[in-house]
Amino acid sequence: MDKSAFQKQLAALRDHRSAAPASMRQAFAADPQRFQAFTATDGDLLLDWSKCAVDATTMDLLEKLAAAADLEGRRAAMFAGKKINITEDRAVLHTALRNLSGTGVTVDGQDVKADVLSVLDAMGAFADAIRSGKALGATGKKITDIVNIGIGGSDLGPAMATLALAPYHDGPRAHYVSNIDGAHIHDTLKGLSAETTLFIVASKTFTTVETMTNAQTARDWVQKALGKQAVGKHFAAVSTALDLVAKFGIEADRVFGFWDWVGGRYSVWGAIGLPVMIAVGPRNFRAFLDGAHEMDQHFRTAPLAGNLPALLGLVGWWHRVICGYPARAVIPYDQRLSRLPAYLQQLDMESNGKGVTLDGTPVATPTGPLVWGEPGTNGQHAFFQLLHQGTDFIPVEFLAAAVGHEPELKHQHDLLLANCLAQSEALMKGRTLDEARAQMLAKGMKPADVDKIAPHRVFSGNRPSLTILYRKLDPRTFGRLIALYEHRVFVEGTLFNINSFDQWGVELGKELATGLLPVVEGKESAANRDASTRGLVERIHQLRGSE
């Protein structure tokens, strides 16, 4: 990053903010080609940011900012396997997991392509064996249910993907257990049979407390129903700790590895995606990878002015840093993407929720926004009130497919799309006091009532939103969408000048929880804890004593 040039562009963008479009209605009225000017496509994916308060000057300044931040250099370093995760001295190469082409991928001078393909082939063989019934349970019955036990990136990605690709399921049912709360695994197991259930334990070190606690509960459940000798037929692992996996009772040919150059929240493309592959089959899983690789190539080669991840990141940075918007709402008008907001919470907030720059100095601008959302139209009947009339402006990101998977329900899909477009239009246009009054008078309301109620029906408008449209949520398109958001996070992290690939905030909580466990169990005193923690522990013990 050229800090001097970056500061110059930052100042220019701040000065420009007051000259950017203040009224989106007027901006569209003044420029009939505004939609064409502020949309970009890649295949059937379309990104429309024309309803955001930007103009040609804004985009030009943002492109210059990206140049000052050396976005192209950072991007090249990532794809080349340079150790851009500086706090852990690691390369960042989740993109290698979906690069099935003939080109090699180098880490520390070694081509890792063969290892990636070897794991993928092993996953495919195992998935086919489970799906076909070649690999049976201990009593000779076919596996009908898969339970993935993991947390964070070992759960959110595959759980989201399994739901997103539901129309392509032709394998065993997939379930996900992540929470240390015993209710999660209890409720999951309640409807399953040990004879026909396979557990996948996803933990790189095989020491993650939440995951291993749930795995031990699952093993006890299998042993109680089928005996200790059955464990090997009902478990698989995604891990690199082969000794601990063997000690647990999982056979070596059921262990699938991954590498430290793949961060947890970027790991769905490899062995962590095993439950997805079993559910939808290796062919559909590879289509998912192919779509992501296509987006990788687009991100690497498309000029900035038409580069979807770069544009999404530039506009996101503009909203966060220059406009000062604290959050972004992700609203998929696609029910099967209902877990996308939760997935993006980890992808974005764990990556860019940082307070120091790459050189360890405090950041001088805001960094990652709060990310949240729910699927449309559900959100319209919950929190859209705040989006339309609340005191905070929150940029909204709409996602929608032109075609659904249920042709017999086309009318419902049309209603879904109409609602999506209407919300986007309403956020942009709003409704003036005069318009509210005219509408109420036209309905025959008394003037006195109109005077009283009209102010409550005013919408300021000018609330930014962008829309991502695609033809249909198939495996390839889904892969492209997720890779699009991954690279968007990278772009924003580059502009923030932070390390988007560590997560020390996660580690702190783990450390403290380890020390607090014996205190909660009553084995150690809480005397050396702060007054609040001490008081809460005492109250827990009191409440338990009342049982």
From Swiss-Prot:
Coiled-coil region: none
Keyword Lipid biosynthesis: no
Enzyme class, spelled out: isomerase
UniProt keyword Cell membrane, yes or no: no
GO molecular function annotations of the record: carbohydrate derivative binding; glucose-6-phosphate isomerase activity; monosaccharide binding
Enzyme Commission number(s): 5.3.1.9
InterPro entries: G6P_Isomerase, G6P_Isomerase_C, Phosphoglucose_isomerase_CS, SIS_dom_sf, SIS_PGI_1, SIS_PGI_2
Alphabetical list of Gene3D superfamilies matching this protein: 1.10.1390.10, Glucose-6-phosphate isomerase like protein, domain 1
Keyword field: Cytoplasm, Gluconeogenesis, Glycolysis, Isomerase
NCBIfam families noted in UniProt: PRK00179.1
Entry function: Catalyzes the reversible isomerization of glucose-6-phosphate to fructose-6-phosphate.
Name under which the protein is recorded: Glucose-6-phosphate isomerase
Record organism: Mesorhizobium japonicum (strain LMG 29417 / CECT 9101 / MAFF 303099)
Gene from which the chain derives: pgi
